[in-house]
Amino acid sequence: MAIPKHSLSPVPWEEDSFLQVKVEEEEEASLSQGGESSHDHIAHSEAARLRFRHFRYEEASGPHEALAHLRALCCQWLQPEAHSKEQILELLVLEQFLGALPPEIQAWVGAQSPKSGEEAAVLVEDLTQVLDKRGWDPGAEPTEASCKQSDLGESEPSNVTETLMGGVSLGPAFVKACEPEGSSERSGLSGEIWTKSVTQQIHFKKTSGPYKDVPTDQRGRESGASRNSSSAWPNLTSQEKPPSEDKFDLVDAYGTEPPYTYSGKRSSKCRECRKMFQSASALEAHQKTHSRKTPYACSECGKAFSRSTHLAQHQVVHTGAKPHECKECGKAFSRVTHLTQHQRIHTGEKPYKCGECGKTFSRSTHLTQHQRVHTGERPYECDACGKAFSQSTHLTQHQRIHTGEKPYKCDACGRAFSDCSALIRHLRIHSGEKPYQCKVCPKAFAQSSSLIEHQRIHTGEKPYKCSDCGKAFSRSSALMVHLRIHITVLQ
């Protein structure tokens, strides 16, 4: 059921809602004292924007004074001495983006005080996902029947806001839920700004609606039970008054708790593990790890993902696109992270260092695998025989012993192998390649293990020792031949 538009509080980005914003001289005095908090800075920036946008030609004595006054107001808002061109551009884009939103969404997003267009877009995405689940149609207009006073009923004034957007209310009860804890200084939805040093008197063009005769200090400054009391709304009919908090519950409207809770530091807490996050999108992505929700499905293969960005990365597998190219060698990659990892081959950068032995690695995954050498951790266990491994690739190769799978085949002779490295070593037989060179003599080998055995000739090392007679050997194969002597004697 839709509702009349007048049940929504006007917001700063509705140009037809505001006539004038007056800010008392205490603002300059308080700002000169320095040490603005983040909340005070946002309030000051919004007040400056409103003064600039609602300046009237009649306030100046002439065109030159009007132009100079506008220029000064613009500088107070955009602060070119403190902001770069990109930051100023971001402010302008953010304002235009908020102004282009549907009024219902615009009111809620504006209350969150987004600092950038990207942050505002994330907030819109979060809200629309919740509303989509409720079956809300942003293009639907309120019907005449839904707006009739007789349909609402005098005994149920909470129906005015309770039915907005398929049951998700953006009315006064939602305002209270969006406020910082312990704060009655700021109305979370109406867009009005309250600071200790700034007093704003806001007058609206609209001549109808629930707030037309309500003083500003009664709309946003009440706290506790007095916020929605009858004395706070003396000029409203019973149908226009905001719903009492005991008749409306935000949890009931959503069906669950709200997606995240607004606070002064914009931090959110996971209900499952109590972990804190700085943004709504980060919290929602984290919560999907508990519920294992994967709403983003690939139309090609049906694989589902918890984030739309992960789906976009996956779809490159089907398209074969590799837009990220290395400027050094021309090799292309489907993901920018893969390009970054590849570029470390050219730069020699190894930013990941082991705290135990100091060894460095170019990839974080390589460091994680290496650290298991120190911890002895072997998290990957074979279901067939129980043997455990420190790396998943080693487990995969081992499992082929049980399955008999040999997916790597030599094109020259047709011989098949269970792992890729074995095929590479085999291919050197056909190519004659011997990449492992002895530093003492000019002899070269096709396999690194053969080079290690050869180097023992120069070093004299004999690590393989017979437990029966104590004789030592440089190769394990030589020890096996020697052991047969003892076996023959015993027989």
Swiss-Prot record:
GO terms for molecular function: DNA-binding transcription factor activity, RNA polymerase II-specific; RNA polymerase II cis-regulatory region sequence-specific DNA binding; zinc ion binding. A zinc finger (C2H2-type) spans 268-290, 296-318, 324-346, 352-374, 380-402, 408-430, 436-458, 464-486. Signal peptide: none annotated. Keywords: DNA-binding, Isopeptide bond, Metal-binding, Nucleus, Phosphoprotein, Repeat, Transcription, Transcription regulation, Ubl conjugation, Zinc, Zinc-finger. Residues 214-224 have a biased composition (Basic and acidic residues). There is a cross-link at K443 (Glycyl lysine isopeptide (Lys-Gly) (interchain with G-Cter in SUMO2)). The modification Phosphoserine is found at S9. It holds the Pfam family zf-C2H2. It is found in: Nucleus. GO terms for cellular component: nucleus. Residues 134-161, 204-249 are annotated as: Disordered. Residues 49-131 form the SCAN box domain. GO terms for biological process: regulation of transcription by RNA polymerase II. Residues 225-241 have a biased composition (Polar residues). PANTHER family: ZINC FINGER PROTEIN, ZINC FINGER PROTEIN 771. May be involved in transcriptional regulation. Belongs to the krueppel C2H2-type zinc-finger protein family. This is Zinc finger and SCAN domain-containing protein 22. It comes from Homo sapiens (Human). The gene is ZSCAN22.
